């Protein structure tokens, strides 16, 4: 648990391996930066939001940048953490679970101002799943081998631009959302 503002920065080859239960890293403080790590080994409990990195409501302005999040249930879960950024990460989910049991690359719940930029996300349920969160930006991400590349639910006043979806069941699922800018995205198979 990261419970105070800090930077957790890995040197080349640094790996954090979880125990296979719970989240590997949980952030409960504002202004945390996690960068340059490989993180693996979360649990598989969907209701508990087991993630490589779980960012709680008390942790606004968290930055997750340049990491490799491999074989976790959820890659990054922004659970109420406003104005957080997830950028330039490689997120490769678990391949040993049925689709209904899999988590998302990035999940966002009630985290206004989230910026999800330049990530490569594969395997799992949805690349980015967002619910009840406004004023977000999802830009220049690449998605493959997922159910939905981007899945919007009850989320308004946001931007989806420059994303690429290849080999997913559906590219963009935009549901019950208003005032979105959706431009220059490509979905191929």
Residue spans for each PLM region:
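Short beta-strand elements of solenoid repeat domains
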Residues: 40, 70, 92, 107, ...
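Short coil-to-beta transitions that initiate beta-strands within beta-rich domains
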Residues: 56-57, 66, 99-111, 145, ...
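Extracellular beta-strand-rich solenoid/capping regions of secreted or surface-exposed proteins
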Residues: 1-7, 16-61, 74-80, 108
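Short "repeat-start/strand-capping" segments in structured domains, especially the N-termini
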Residues: 4-6, 30-31, 60, 81-84, ...
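A generic beta-sheet turn/junction motif
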Residues: 20, 29, 57-59, 71, ...
């Amino acid at each position: 648990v990261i419970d105070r503002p800090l930077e957790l920065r890995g040197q080349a080859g640094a790996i954090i391996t979880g125990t296979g239960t719970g989240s590997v890293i949980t952030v409960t403080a504002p202004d945390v930066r996690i960068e340059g790590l490989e993180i693996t080994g979360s649990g598989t409990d969907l209701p508990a939001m087991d993630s490589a990195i779980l960012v709680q409501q008390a942790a606004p302005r968290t930055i997750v940048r340049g990491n490799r999040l491999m074989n976790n249930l959820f890659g990054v879960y922004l659970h109420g953490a406003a104005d957080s950024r997830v950028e330039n990460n490689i997120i490769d989910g678990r391949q040993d679970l049925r689709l209904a049991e899999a988590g998302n690359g990035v999940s966002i719940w009630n985290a206004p101002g989230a910026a999800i930029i330049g990530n490569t996300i594969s395997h799992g349920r949805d690349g980015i799943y967002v619910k009840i969160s406004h004023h977000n930006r999802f830009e220049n991400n690449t998605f493959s081998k997922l159910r939905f590349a981007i899945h919007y639910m009850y989320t308004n006043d946001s931007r989806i631009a420059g994303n690429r979806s290849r080999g997913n069941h559906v590219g963009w699922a935009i549901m019950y959302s208003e005032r979105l800018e959706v431009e220059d995205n490509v979905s191929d198979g």
